[in-house]
């Protein structure tokens, strides 16, 4: 990824974290998807089967969804759902998109629906709960912290970019 695209991703993440766009940030990273069972090359990250599904939208069973966890620079564990396209081929590279909702929203709501729809169109997508929201860690709940939320986006991009 070149510097201009990286800067644009950071700017979009900042705007979205502040609630200005409330949609998604395009990562434009090709995801090497050789073996997802190995999770990611990132330290303190994991991928597991999605159990106890609480999504509030109609679930497309053709899209494989994994439960993921990764740590941001502030030490918060960020919880997410990794959506894999229909007929996912681990020998191919895929474009990736990371998505979160506006303040207080969780991955089981609109960001998960967007992630599912993008996965239907061939993207690897990651919908995540911002720190201090949903299943992500942080003892101060429902608190806005643009710097931490921006770091959540950086950590999400790092996680997806480092998939094996």
Residue ranges and their predicted role:
Residues 104-116, 130:
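The serine-hydrolase catalytic nucleophile loop
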Residues 91-102:
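Short beta-strand element of the alpha/beta-hydrolase
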Residues 143-164:
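Alpha/beta-hydrolase active-site loop
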Residues 11-16:
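Hydrophobic helical h-region of N-terminal Sec-dependent signal peptides
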Residues 44-92:
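N-terminal cap/lid segment of alpha/beta-hydrolase-fold proteins
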Residues 117-137:
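Conserved alpha/beta-hydrolase
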Residues 1-10, 28:
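Bacterial Sec-dependent N-terminal signal peptides
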């Amino acid at each position: 990824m070149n510097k201009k695209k990286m800067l644009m991703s950071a700017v979009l993440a900042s705007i979205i974290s502040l609630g200005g766009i409330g949609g998604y940030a395009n990562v434009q990273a090709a995801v090497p998807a050789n073996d997802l069972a190995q999770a990611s090359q990132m330290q303190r990250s994991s991928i597991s089967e999605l159990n106890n599904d609480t999504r509030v939208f109609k679930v497309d069973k053709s899209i494989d969804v994994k439960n993921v966890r990764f740590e941001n620079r502030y030490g918060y564990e960020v919880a997410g759902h990794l959506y894999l396209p229909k007929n996912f081929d681990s020998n191919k590279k895929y474009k990736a998109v990371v998505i979160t909702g506006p303040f207080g929203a969780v991955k089981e709501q609109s960001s998960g629906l967007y992630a599912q729809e993008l996965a239907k169109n061939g993207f690897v997508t990651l919908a995540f709960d911002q720190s201090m929201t949903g299943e992500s860690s942080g003892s101060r709940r429902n608190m806005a912290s643009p710097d931490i939320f921006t770091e959540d986006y950086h950590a999400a991009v790092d996680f997806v970019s480092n998939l094996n």
